């Protein structure tokens, strides 16, 4: 018997689209123009200015910087380390994340939703906190200090996998839970062993999602800043950290400009591959059968009274090991170590948060820095959600003309650029551009929120966009046929779906802003630093008290971030964003 709901959806009227009214054209033009103006003023202008200072030092084009930079052996070493950490971080994240996607999205077991929520926590943690957590774990005297991994390249790769594991789990798992299991079951019934059924049936169907996740993870790994700086220092520098070194320590804008261009090439290639993979994934999802057919399997399901070790036990064991050993251990150790001072259990580290540290290491107390971070993050979140929602509304449209579709695709890719361009480049570019003329923001309280919003906008877009693209276009057509104006269609059809995605978008934007370090380290005024900046200063100062305060401050920042995401998770609808 046909499902009545499905029947009603199928019978929605399909009419020819009329030409949009001038008011609708003006409205959509404004919706696209405001974000483009924001991106042009607060991203393109600062970045291009910094690059221009390097290539046009005396007003004339000078490309000799490329020869100077690429003739230095250090540059090739940095490029090799950048690509190596990107490739290795991506490979391990995918290898460990695919079993996690199966367990958390295709199997049922008590506490599954709790584990799903927990694996999301590392991704939203500030990178400085992640670096401190792994450093505390691997330092001499730490639980894993005997391994001798403190300050090594494997430690950086492990921290990157910790940070990006959830990207693979959520992206692949979101598609896996919608796959119809019957083709794999048919292969099994024909005698194929579990591994063969998976590699010949399920894995090809998951390839678009895996490729999309891998492209994003590579982007995050190759452009990591806080994690590399805390764990590797300058010994294992990357292009990202080298841009910071050249701008802050040597003021060599030409070298920084060349490295920024190199990074833009890497980022552009990653974004192009990610966009292609994402399109394939969306087309694949459109071809899936009724989601009701994709019934979650009971973990360790019995077949003929015996466990299926190849199908259930192996991925369950890998996932349990990752969750406990890779995700939980650094966080638990950070929490435990924050209560140790002078070799005894104590609250001294937390009490010291009300001071400026040993030898006045800070200009404000940690609690004052926390208040600064919260206030700035609220402002940045409002800006990012406003701009990101406008972008998502425009990009979610499905025009009939090919030029319009290409323009929308270009707009989508354009607003992904802040994800990969060095936050250091953006921050230093702010100092060069927003200090004169009509946009003189020197000393303004809005400059840091704007810089953080630039970084958070792509996250908002990628969170809200899947929700809007899930809307059946026939719903909009039906509303228009019934006489609704374009504005009313947007309010009554898109509005309810948009509200479902805004909760998670608010949480992600707030978490990203709260933990942003690269641009903020340039722009935060000495009398009003943010919490990540304060933590980095504390771990760079000698003294056990300062280090203990850094641990306690990291716990505070992690707890605030996790709390915000927990509240955002309660506000979201049943459909999650891409990450």
Regions found by a protein language model. Give the residues of each.
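Transmembrane alpha-helical segments of polytopic membrane transport and secretion proteins
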Residues: 1-34, 274-321, 399-406, 568-579
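Polytopic alpha-helical membrane proteins, predominantly small-molecule transporters/carriers
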Residues: 79, 191-193, 200, 370, ...
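Glycine-rich helix-loop "coupling/hinge" segments at transmembrane-helix boundaries
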Residues: 226-251, 341-345, 517-547, 577
């Amino acid at each position: 018997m046909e499902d009545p709901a499905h029947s009603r959806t199928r019978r929605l009227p399909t009419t020819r689209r009329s030409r949009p009214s001038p008011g609708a054209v003006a409205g959509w033009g404004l919706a696209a123009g405001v974000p483009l103006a924001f991106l042009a003023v607060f991203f393109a202008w600062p970045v291009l200015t910094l690059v221009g200072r390097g290539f046009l030092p005396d007003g004339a084009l000078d490309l000799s910087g490329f020869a100077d930079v690429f003739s230095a052996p250090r540059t090739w070493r940095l490029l090799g380390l950048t690509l190596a950490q990107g490739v290795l971080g991506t490979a391990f994240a995918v290898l460990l994340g695919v079993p996690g996607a199966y367990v958390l999205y295709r199997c049922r077991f008590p506490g599954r939703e709790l584990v799903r929520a927990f694996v999301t926590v590392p991704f939203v943690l500030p990178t400085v906190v992640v670096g401190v957590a792994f450093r505390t774990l691997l330092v001499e005297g730490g639980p894993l200090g005997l391994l001798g991994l403190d300050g090594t390249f494997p430690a950086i790769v492990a921290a990157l996998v910790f940070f990006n594991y959830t990207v693979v789990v959520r992206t692949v798992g979101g598609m896996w839970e919608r796959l119809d299991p019957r083709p794999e079951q048919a292969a099994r019934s024909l005698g194929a062993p579990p591994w063969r059924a998976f590699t010949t049936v399920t894995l090809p169907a998951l390839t678009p999602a895996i490729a999309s996740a891998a492209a994003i993870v590579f982007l995050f790994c190759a452009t990591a800043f806080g994690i590399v700086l805390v764990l590797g220092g300058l010994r294992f520098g990357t292009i990202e950290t080298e841009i910071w070194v050249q701008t802050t320590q040597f003021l060599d804008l030409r070298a920084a400009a060349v490295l920024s261009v190199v990074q833009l090439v890497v980022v552009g290639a990653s974004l192009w591959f990610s966009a292609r993979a994402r399109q394939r994934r969306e087309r694949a999802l459109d071809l899936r059968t009724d989601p009701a057919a994709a019934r979650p399997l009971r973990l360790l399901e019995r077949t003929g009274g015996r466990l299926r070790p190849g199908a259930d036990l192996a991925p369950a064991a890998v996932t349990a090991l990752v969750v406990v050993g890779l995700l939980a251990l650094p966080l638990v150790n950070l929490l435990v170590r924050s209560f140790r001072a002078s070799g005894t259990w104590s609250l001294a580290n937390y009490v010291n948060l009300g001071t400026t540290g040993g030898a006045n290491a800070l200009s404000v107390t940690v609690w004052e820095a926390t208040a600064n971070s919260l206030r700035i993050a609220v402002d940045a979140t409002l800006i990012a959600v406003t701009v990101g929602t406008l972008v998502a509304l425009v990009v979610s449209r499905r025009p009939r003309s090919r030029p319009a579709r290409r323009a929308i695709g270009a707009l989508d890719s354009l607003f992904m650029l802040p994800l990969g361009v060095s936050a250091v480049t953006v921050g230093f570019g702010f100092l060069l551009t927003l200090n004169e003329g009509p946009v003189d923001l020197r000393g303004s309280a809005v400059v840091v929120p704007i810089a953080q919003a630039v970084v958070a906008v792509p996250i908002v877009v990628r969170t809200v966009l899947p929700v809007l693209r899930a809307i059946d276009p026939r719903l909009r057509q039906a509303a228009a046929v019934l006489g609704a104006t374009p504005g009313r269609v947007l309010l009554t059809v898109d509005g309810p779906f948009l509200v479902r995605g805004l909760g998670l978008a608010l949480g992600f934007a707030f978490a990203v802003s709260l933990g942003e370090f690269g641009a903020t380290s340039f722009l935060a005024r000495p009398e009003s630093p943010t919490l990540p900046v304060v933590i980095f200063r504390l771990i760079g100062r000698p003294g056990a008290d300062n280090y203990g305060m850094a641990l306690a401050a990291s716990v505070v920042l992690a707890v605030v971030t996790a709390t915000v995401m927990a509240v955002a998770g309660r506000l979201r609808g049943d459909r999650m964003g891409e990450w």
